[in-house]
Amino acid sequence: MSVADDDLGSLQGHIRRTLRSIHNLPYFRYTRGPTERADMSRALKEFIYRYLYFVISNSGENLPTLFNAHPKQKLSNPELTVFPDSLEDAVDIDKITSQQTIPFYKIDESRIGDVHKHTGRNCGRKFKIGEPLYRCHECGCDDTCVLCIHCFNPKDHVNHHVCTDICTEFTSGICDCGDEEAWNSPLHCKAEEQENDISEDPATNADIKEEDVWNDSVNIALVELVLAEVFDYFIDVFNQNIEPLPTIQKDITIKLREMTQQGKMYERAQFLNDLKYENDYMFDGTTTAKTSPSNSPEASPSLAKIDPENYTVIIYNDEYHNYSQATTALRQGVPDNVHIDLLTSRIDGEGRAMLKCSQDLSSVLGGFFAVQTNGLSATLTSWSEYLHQETCKYIILWITHCLNIPNSSFQTTFRNMMGKTLCSEYLNATECRDMTPVVEKYFSNKFDKNDPYRYIDLSILADGNQIPLGHHKILPESSTHSLSPLINDVETPTSRTYSNTRLQHILYFDNRYWKRLRKDIQNVIIPTLASSNLYKPIFCQQVVEIFNHITRSVAYMDREPQLTAIRECVVQLFTCPTNAKNIFENQSFLDIVWSIIDIFKEFCKVEGGVLIWQRVQKSNLTKSYSISFKQGLYTVETLLSKVHDPNIPLRPKEIISLLTLCKLFNGAWKIKRKEGEHVLHEDQNFISYLEYTTSIYSIIQTAEKVSEKSKDSIDSKLFLNAIRIISSFLGNRSLTYKLIYDSHEVIKFSVSHERVAFMNPLQTMLSFLIEKVSLKDAYEALEDCSDFLKISDFSLRSVVLCSQIDVGFWVRNGMSVLHQASYYKNNPELGSYSRDIHLNQLAILWERDDIPRIIYNILDRWELLDWFTGEVDYQHTVYEDKISFIIQQFIAFIYQILTERQYFKTFSSLKDRRMDQIKNSIIYNLYMKPLSYSKLLRSVPDYLTEDTTEFDEALEEVSVFVEPKGLADNGVFKLKASLYAKVDPLKLLNLENEFESSATIIKSHLAKDKDEIAKVVLIPQVSIKQLDKDALNLGAFTRNTVFAKVVYKLLQVCLDMEDSTFLNELLHLVHGIFRDDELINGKDSIPEAYLSKPICNLLLSIANAKSDVFSESIVRKADYLLEKMIMKKPNELFESLIASFGNQYVNDYKDKKLRQGVNLQETEKERKRRLAKKHQARLLAKFNNQQTKFMKEHESEFDEQDNDVDMVGEKVYESEDFTCALCQDSSSTDFFVIPAYHDHSPIFRPGNIFNPNEFMPMWDGFYNDDEKQAYIDDDVLEALKENGSCGSRKVFVSCNHHIHHNCFKRYVQKKRFSSNAFICPLCQTFSNCTLPLCQTSKANTGLSLDMFLESELSLDTLSRLFKPFTEENYRTINSIFSLMISQCQGFDKAVRKRANFSHKDVSLILSVHWANTISMLEIASRLEKPYSISFFRSREQKYKTLKNILVCIMLFTFVIGKPSMEFEPYPQQPDTVWNQNQLFQYIVRSALFSPVSLRQTVTEALTTFSRQFLRDFLQGLSDAEQVTKLYAKASKIGDVLKVSEQMLFALRTISDVRMEGLDSESIIYDLAYTFLLKSLLPTIRRCLVFIKVLHELVKDSENETLVINGHEVEEELEFEDTAEFVNKALKMITEKESLVDLLTTQESIVSHPYLENIPYEYCGIIKLIDLSKYLNTYVTQSKEIKLREERSQHMKNADNRLDFKICLTCGVKVHLRADRHEMTKHLNKNCFKPFGAFLMPNSSEVCLHLTQPPSNIFISAPYLNSHGEVGRNAMRRGDLTTLNLKRYEHLNRLWINNEIPGYISRVMGDEFRVTILSNGFLFAFNREPRPRRIPPTDEDDEDMEEGEDGFFTEGNDEMDVDDETGQAANLFGVGAEGIAGGGVRDFFQFFENFRNTLQPQGNGDDDAPQNPPPILQFLGPQFDGATIIRNTNPRNLDEDDSDDNDDSDEREIW
C-alpha cells in the first residue's frame, strides 16, 4: 500500500492516535513488577521501532532499502515475515510479546561505512567512547575543530602537527568535517573518497537506485510528517510533566503530605488528577476521581474509590547524594526490587528509576514520602504518564537509530526534515493542554499574575503553551556615555516575540528530562542541526533567543545543571564565525552579556559606593551557580574570540556591557592582614573569586588579541572613548589624602592595616587600551580624570601586597595568601602584575609636574615614608625585622618601573612584536638551565605559543639544540652563549628567580674561568629603541633630588648596618639609573642629584670594605660604578672624595686601581694606548690557548712509549675473589650462591633451508624494515607459544652477585620471599632460583685450554679445578643442592615427574639450559658489528654468567654424582622438536659427559650436520625452474657465493645432482654452498663461545686473550667474509683444516639420537617486530595498517578505537578489555607466555609486562620527535615522531637476553617485593599488576598517569588464565594504584582488612558490576562470574563490554 498526498492527513491522525493512546493497549495498561517492567520495556521499544519504521517507509515499501533480513530470523523460523505486512501488523503488540517477531531493524554491519558519508553536509558525527579525535594545528581554525576517524584523511595533513585525543565521557564532541569555517584549507573527506571508489563498481548501481526513493517528494513528506508528529507528542508529554521541576517539586510533596495528614482524600485525588498527563485519548478506566459531588467523602465513605489507581514512585538522580546516602534513602522507601544496589546504579546511570508501583495509591504513598526524608527527589506519577514518558524515550532512541542507518539518501532526507520540523513553529501549542491553570490553582503563592516573569521563574510555558518572557535587559543610548558605580540604567521589555519552535520548546524543557534522556536528546539534536549548513544559523538564532531562559534555568531551576544543553550549544554554535557575526550584528551579544550580568548581580553587594560580586553564601548543593557563572563567562570569551570586526567590542553599548561585567570583579576579593596568633583554619573563600576573576582576565585578553590582530582597521576614537569611560569611572572615586611636607598631597592608605585587593581587571583593561594608542592621545582622553594617582594607586597596592606577602609579613594569614600572591604575580597569562607596573609608569609620566609627590606616594604605599622622613628609625618600622627584605622588593619594583618598557615600544608589525616577546621569554627560561622542548613550551605563556612556527623560529635564533645522549633522556635547548649578556636578573621576566643566584649563573657563562666570575659586572638592560617619544623621560623621576636621597639613605643603611641583603639590587638599580641617564643625556652625563648627594663617597666605602662585610661581587660592582663616575667627571668626584676621606685615602685608592691597570686620571690618548696593548695581549693569549689545545689533542703522537710495563709474563693462578653482597665478608667458609632468573626464552625458531630470506641477508647490525610493518607468519607465532611452554627451551640470566647461602636464607626470611621468587638484595633484579658456587683455581691442576681441545674435556676433568672438600663441606653443599632441586622442581617440572628421574639427572637438564644460554648470547650478538667477533666483545657479564652456570654443573656432578647417560630428559620423538639448537646440544652434552676431546666432538657434529643439510637441500630441489627461481630470489637479496673446484668436488661427493635445463649446473651448488655456510655459522660461533667460557676457567691472568693453535682468536677472525671465517674457525675448533676437508672426510659417522634428523634452526636475525618509521602512522592511519587483531567478540567499534596495544613480540594488535587483562590473556593464549613488550601508540609508550608475578612498567616508546623528545611529550603537539634505532635496539636487547623481568623489578624497586608477596595463594585474588613508569631523565616530563594493567595468577604451568581472572576490588586495600597509605609496610596490615572483609558490605562503584558477599569475592571466580576492577569505569570502554565480561562468551578475533 502506498501513501498518496491525500492520505497524509489520515496517516497523521493514525500516528497521533497510536502514540497518545498507547496506554490503552491491554499489555501496557496496568502496573507490574520489576521483572515484568523489563519485559515491557523491550516490547515497548520494539513496538515504537516497528511502527515508526513502517510508517516512515511508506507502509513498509522502502524498508528493504534500509535493512536486510535479520539472519537470526531466517535461521530460527523462515515462516516469520521479515517486515510488517500492514499497519495492523506493525502495531500488533501481541505478536511482539509472544516473540513471533525478531527485530528487523538491525543495521547491516557490512554497510556500516556508508553512514559516514556526508555528501553535501557536515559530518556532525558524535564521537563514541574510545574513539580518536584528530586535531590539525595547521588546518584547524582553533582547538575545537576536530575530525573523526572516518573523515580524517592523512593525505591532507602531510608534515602537519596532528594530535589525537581519546574520546571519554568528559572529552567528547562532534566531527567538523565539511564545515568550511572550521578549516583553514579545503579537506578531502576520507569517507567520501571511499564512496567514490565504491561508486565506480557496477554492482553498486542497483543500490544507488534503491536509495533514490528517499528523494521522492512523497517519502520526504512522510519523513517530515512522522518527525513533526513525534516531536509534537514529545513536547506535549513533557509540557505536562511539571512534577520533577525543582521550583515546585517540594511544594507538591508538602501539599500531598498535608492532604494525607488532614484526611483530604478527595482534594488529594483531584490534585493528582490535575497533575497527571492527559490527552484526548484518555478514558475514565485509569481513575475514578472526578469533580462530581458523588465522589466526595460524604457521598462515598469508601476511600478506595476516591483514590486514583495505577501510580508509581519515580526517583530522580541528583548531584548531592553519595552512594551510601542514596542506598539508605531507597531502603526507607521499601522498593519492589530487592536489589537496592541495582536500583541505585540505575538511578546514577539512567538518571531515574522506579521505586515501586501499584494499582493502590496508598501502597506507594508511604514510600514516596519516606525516600524524600533524606532529600532524594521523587515524583508520584501515574502509570499512564510513566508509559508515555518511556515512549518518548524510545522515540528519541529511534531517531538516534535512524541517524545511523547506512543509506546516504535516507540520511540526507531524514536530517533535512529533522532540521525543518525542529526549527518550525510549534503549531499544536494551542491544541495541547495548558498547565498554567493548574499551577495558578495550586501554587498561587508562587504565581503572581502581575509579575511578567511568573512563568520563567517557575520554568513553565506561558499561556497558550508559548515560550514565556525572559529577564531581558536593554541598554539605552543614554546609558552608553559613562560607567555607573552600580549598574547602568537598563530597560526591561514587557514583551518579546520568540520563534516558538519545537526546538525552543524541547530546549526549554531541558531541566525536566532525566539524565540519560537528556544526553540522548542533546546527542540527537545538537550534532544533527549543527552539521547542517542550512539549519545551523537558524538553530543558533533560536538558541540565542532563549539563552536567557536556559541560563537562568541552569542557575536556579536545574537538578543536574552539569548536564545542561547550553554547554554543547556554545561549543558547536558560538565557535562558528558566521554565527558569531550574526550574533553581534543582531545585537544579540548584548542580550547574552546582560543575561550573564543579571545572574552575577544577584550575588553582588555595594562596597565603597561600587557594586561588586561577593561569594555565594547560600546553600547550593547542585553547584548550579558555579556552573552558570563559568558557562556564562566562557560564552562571552568564546564569542569575543570569533569577532570579525575588532570595532564591535569597542562600540559604546558593547564596551559598557563588557566593562559592567568586569567591574563586578574589580577589587572584589579583598583581604586584611591578621595579627596575633596564627590562623587555625585558612580561608578558602578566595578560590571562587580567583576562578571567576581569572575568567574576566581571559575575556580582557581575548578582546586585546582581536584588537591586536586588526589594529590598523580599528577606529581610534573607539579606543579613546573606552579609555575615557574607564578612567572616568576609576578616577572619580572618593579617596582620602594626607599632606607631606605641607606641600604634597598623597593618598592616605595602609596596605598592612586595611582591606586590599590583588586583582583589578578594569585597571588591566585600561592598560591594554592605552598601549594601543599613542601616549599623547591617551593623555588627552583622560579629561575626566584629574588625578591619575587615583587609578595607579590601586595597582600600586597590589604590588605592595604581593611583596609584603612574599617577605612573610602576612604569615599569620596562612599559606593561602602566599599561593594567591604567587598566582597573581607569576602568572604571565593574566598579565596583571606587569600591567600594574605599566599604570604606575603612566602615573610618573603624566603626573610629571609634581615628581616628589609621586615618589612620596610610592614610599607611603610601601610604608617606608616614615623612615624616609626620619619619624622612625630603620629598625623600628612597621616591618620590624623584615625591613631589609621589603626594601629588596621595593628596589626591584623601582627597577622595573625604570626598565620595563615593552608597553611603550612601537613595532613595524604584529609579528615583530610577538617575536620580540617570544625571544625574551625563551631567553629568560633557558638561561638558568637547558630545557626540553615541552618544558620550555609550558614555561612560555600560551598566548605566545599559539603559533609554534614563530616559536620555533625564535627558538632557533636564540638557542642551540643538544641531542639526547642517553637511552631515556630528552634533547634539550641551551641558550646561545652570546645572549647571556642580555639577561637582566632584576627584570620582570626573572621574577620567579632570586637576584643573586640568577646573577651568579649569568656571570658563570660570561666569565672565561671560575676565578673571573666575581669580577664580571652585569649591565642593566635599559633601552630607548622603538620607544614612544613621550616615554623617553620615564627615568626622570630617578634623577630627582628626592629619589637620590632615597638611594643615598639606603646605601648609608647598608654601610651602617653592614647588611648586604638588598645591596646587590640597589647597586644594580644605581647602575640602571646611570645607564638611562647616558641614553638620554649622553655618555659623559651623571645625574646632578647624585653629585649633590655624595653617592660616590658611599660607593668608595663599599669598594674598600673588608671581605667579610660585603661579597666580592658587591665590592666589584661598587668599584665599577665609582670608576665610571670618576671617568666622567674626575675633578668633581675626587674633590668630593678627598673632602670626605682625605688625600691619603684617595691616593691609596688610585694606586690600587693603577695596580689593576686602571689609571683614573689618564688622558683619552693614554687610555686608547692602554686599550690597544690590552687587545694585543688578548690576541697573544688566544694563540697560546690554540697551541695548548693542539698539543693536548695530539698528545699521543708526542708521548714516548718506553714507560709501558709489560705484564704478559706474569702468571696469576689465584681464583676469582668472592665477596658476599649482604655481609661484605670475603673470608667466610660458607658456600656462595648467585641469584638467577631461569625461564623460557622467545628466541628459538625453526629454520627453512629453502628460504633465501633466512640465509642471504647480511648480519649488518640492528635494523628495522618499516615496509614490512608487523606481519609475522604462523610458524613464528607457533614457535613463540612453544618457546613459552616447552621446558627444554629455558635459559639463565644472572646479575652474578655472590651471596653466602646462610646470608641468603636470612634475607629471604626477613623479606618474606621464597627461594623461587625474590629480588637480588644488591641490584633488585628479579630472580627465581639460586645457583651454588665455590671458588676454582687452576693451580697445580695441569689443566689448559689446549688440553680440552686436543685430549679430553669432561666434567670429571673440570672438577679438578675445585679445592679439596672437607666432609662438612660435602654435607653442606649436598643439602644446598637438595634444597635447590626441590625448590626449582629439578629445573623442569615435567621431566622431574618422569618415573626414572633421579636427582643426579638434574645436571643433564642444566646442561641443556646452559647450551640454550650460550645460544641466546650468540643470537643476540647477530645484531651487532662485526658479526664475526661480536659475541666476544662487551659481554663480560654474560660470560661470567656462563662460567658460573658451568661451575654450578661441575659442582653438582662433583657432589651429587654423575647422571645416568641412559636417561634422556628430552627424548627424541617423531613429531616433537625439543630444541631447535639440537646440534649444539649434542656438542655440549658430549663435551661435558663424555671423555673425548672437544675438537673431536665438534668435528663429528658439524660433519654429520653438513652432510644431512646438503642431501636435504640438493635432493629437495625438484626441477630446474625451481632452482632458477630460488637463485634469482637469493641473488636479489645478497651475493650468492661461487664454489671453487675443490668445493664443487666435495659437494658432489655428498650428493651428485644432474638437472637438465639449468644455464649453469654449478648454480645449484652455489646455492647449497652459500646456504650451508650460513647454517653452520650459528653453531660455530656457539662453539667459540663455549671455548671462551673454558678459557675463562683456566686463564692465567685477568687480561689474557683467547689463543688457539697459537693464533689470537679475535684478531684472526675479525673480518666480514663468511667463507673465510668458517674455514678459519673450523681449523681452530675441529680436527680439519677447512670446510672442504670437513666435507671430504672418510671417517665413519657417529651414531647418536641427537645427530639423527637434526632440526634446522633459523639462522637469520631474531628481533622484535618491525615498526612503522613514524609512530603517528599508527594513530593517523590505524585502519590502513592491517595488523592481526585480538579482542573480545563483544567489542563494538574496534576498528575506530586507538586504545589498543601492539605486541612487539608477535605484532598482534591487542584491544583494551573491560577487565584490563588483555596483555596477560594475549601472552598466555597466543604468544610467548612469561613476559612481553607492548607498544601503546596513542601515548608513545611501551608497556613491559611480566606475567608472573603480574607486573607492569611503562617506558617511553623508541620514537623521538624533531625536538629530541620521547614518550607522551613527543606526540603531545602532533609532532612527527620517528623511530630511533638505537633506543629500539636497546629495548630489543632487553627482550632477546631475557632481561625484561629484571628490568621491571629494578624499576619498581621495593614495590616489586609487594608484587611477589601478593602473588601467593592467600593474595592471589586481589592482585593487579603494578603499573609503573620509568622516572624520566628529564625531571619535567609530565602526565605520569597510571596506565593499563593485566593480571595472571599461575597455580601451575598448564593453568588457563581464564580460570584465574576473578578478583575482588580493593579487598585488602591493595590495588593497581598502590598500597593504601602509600607505603610498602602498610601492605602487611592487610590481615586486619581481611578480617573486616568477611562482613557484608555494599559496593561503592556505581558503574561496576555489584559486589557479591565479600567471602565469595575472596574465594574467586568459580563462586562469582563478575570481575570487578578498581577504578575502571565501564563507560570509558565500549558500552557492550560492560554487560558481559565472562571469558566463556569471549573469543579471539584474528
UniProtKB/Swiss-Prot annotation:
Biased composition (Acidic residues): 1833-1846, 1934-1950
Region Ubiquitin-binding loop, residue ranges: 678-681
Result of altering residue 1186 to A: In FQFH mutant; strongly reduced N-end rule-dependent protein degradation
Catalytic activity line of the entry: S-ubiquitinyl-[E2 ubiquitin-conjugating enzyme]-L-cysteine + [acceptor protein]-L-lysine = [E2 ubiquitin-conjugating enzyme]-L-cysteine + N(6)-ubiquitinyl-[acceptor protein]-L-lysine
Region (Cap helical domain (CHD)): 1333-1665
Mutagenesis or variant effect for residue 1763 to A: In DHHY mutant; abolished E3 ubiquitin protein ligase activity
PROSITE patterns, per database record: ZF_UBR
Binding site for Zn(2+) 6: 1295, 1297, 1320, 1323
Annotated Zn(2+) 1 binding sites: 118, 151, 177, 189
Residues noted as binding Zn(2+) 4 in the record, renumbered to the chain: 161, 952, 1763, 1775
Substitution effect: residue 1183 to A: In FQFH mutant; strongly reduced N-end rule-dependent protein degradation
GO BP terms in the entry: cellular response to unfolded protein; cytoplasm protein quality control by the ubiquitin-proteasome system; ERAD pathway; mitochondria-associated ubiquitin-dependent protein catabolic process; protein monoubiquitination; protein polyubiquitination; protein ubiquitination; regulation of dipeptide transport
ZnF segments: UBR-type: 121-194
Impact upon substituting residue 176 to N/E: Abolished ability to degrade proteins with type-1 N-degrons without affecting ability to degrade proteins with type-2 N-degrons
Molecular function via GO: proteasome regulatory particle binding; ubiquitin protein ligase activity; ubiquitin-protein transferase activity; zinc ion binding
Enzyme Commission number(s) of this protein: 2.3.2.27
Outcome of mutating residue 161 to A: In DHHY mutant; abolished E3 ubiquitin protein ligase activity
Consequence when changing residue 1320 to S: No effect on interaction with UBC2, but inhibits degradation of N-end rule substrates
Listed result of changing residue 1190 to A: In FQFH mutant; strongly reduced N-end rule-dependent protein degradation
Domain of life: Eukaryota
Positions bearing Phosphoserine: 296, 300, 1938
Subunit composition and interactions: Interacts with UBC2. Interacts with RPN2, RPT1 and RPT6 from the 26S proteasome.
Free-text function comment from the UniProt entry: Ubiquitin ligase protein which is a component of the N-end rule pathway. Recognizes and binds to proteins bearing specific N-terminal residues that are destabilizing according to the N-end rule, leading to their ubiquitination and subsequent degradation. Recognizes both type-1 and type-2 N-degrons, containing positively charged amino acids (Arg, Lys and His) and bulky and hydrophobic amino acids, respectively.
Name of this protein: E3 ubiquitin-protein ligase UBR1
